């Protein structure tokens, strides 16, 4: 075969296609291990859990506020309990609040783990969904890096940005020990719950109404974030 024929064969030889795990939009940068699959599976579980809880929202809102606070750790539960405590109708409220803090952070370790396993990969997956998502993530990441571990205490700011998601992932990226992350996360959540409790104590029913309206939006944003990450990764894996 002449050199000219060899050149023609090389020109027509298709380049080897990248492996499925190396496709754009996957959180990992190498062939996934069992840990990667487990972490991705936990993301799927969180999404399913969040969707399953939606029909229970009306039931939860109808519970005695301290019980709702202990079961969910929600802002509404904390504020409602504060309103009751101000008139002496919520004994042992601190115990309910502390239990609620533990319940509220039960899945946060998954985001820390994703950051430890995949680094910015998990942020890039979410940023690819839209220009707005990419802009919001970049904005949060910028100030979160400057704050370092103190960013955990701003993770629960009630604004429609993926603050907790980005901050928790960054804590995993920076190799913060899991025990330290969970302790700081628990303290942060407890302080914020005490803040909502105080608002309920001082203001009463109006602050509860405002938090209810915010929760309607925030819950859907949080669930949508997890579902998009899980479904996007699974669809690309099948390809």
PLM regions: where:
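Hydrophobic alpha-helical transmembrane bundles that constitute the permease/transmembrane domains
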Residues: 162-166, 186-194
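Hydrophobic transmembrane-helix microenvironments that flank and shape a buried ionizable site
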Residues: 70-72, 104-105, 186
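Hydrophobic cores of alpha-helical transmembrane segments in multi-pass inner/ER membrane proteins
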Residues: 79-83, 224-230
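Transmembrane helix boundary and interhelical junction motifs in multipass membrane proteins
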Residues: 56-91, 159-170
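Membrane-interfacial helix-loop-helix
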Residues: 1-64, 88-160, 204-221, 232-239
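Transmembrane alpha-helical segments of integral membrane proteins
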Residues: 194-206
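Membrane-interface alpha-helices at helix entry/exit sites of multi-pass transporters
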Residues: 90-99, 132, 173-190
């Amino acid at each position: 075969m002449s050199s000219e024929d060899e050149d023609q064969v090389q020109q027509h030889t298709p380049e080897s296609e990248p492996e499925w795990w190396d496709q754009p939009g996957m959180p990992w940068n190498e062939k996934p291990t069992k840990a990667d699959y487990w972490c991705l599976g936990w993301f799927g579980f969180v999404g399913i859990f969040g969707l399953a809880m939606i029909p229970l929202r009306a039931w939860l809102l109808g519970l005695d506020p301290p019980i709702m606070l202990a079961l969910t750790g929600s802002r509404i539960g904390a504020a409602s309990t504060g309103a009751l405590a101000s008139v002496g109708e919520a004994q042992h409220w601190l115990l309910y609040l502390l239990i609620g803090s533990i319940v509220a952070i039960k899945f946060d370790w998954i985001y820390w783990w994703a950051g430890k396993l995949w680094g910015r990969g998990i942020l890039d997956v979410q940023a690819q969904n839209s220009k707005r998502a990419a802009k919001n993530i970049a904005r949060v990441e910028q100030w979160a890096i400057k704050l370092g571990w103190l960013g955990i205490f701003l993770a629960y700011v009630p604004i429609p940005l993926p603050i907790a998601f980005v901050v928790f992932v960054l804590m995993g990226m920076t190799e913060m020990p899991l025990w330290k992350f969970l302790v700081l996360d628990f303290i942060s959540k407890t302080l914020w719950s005490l803040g909502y409790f105080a608002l309920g104590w001082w203001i009463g029913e109006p602050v509860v109404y405002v938090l209810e309206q915010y929760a309607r939006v925030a819950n859907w944003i949080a669930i949508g974030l997890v579902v998009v990450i899980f479904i996007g990764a699974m669809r690309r894996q099948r390809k």
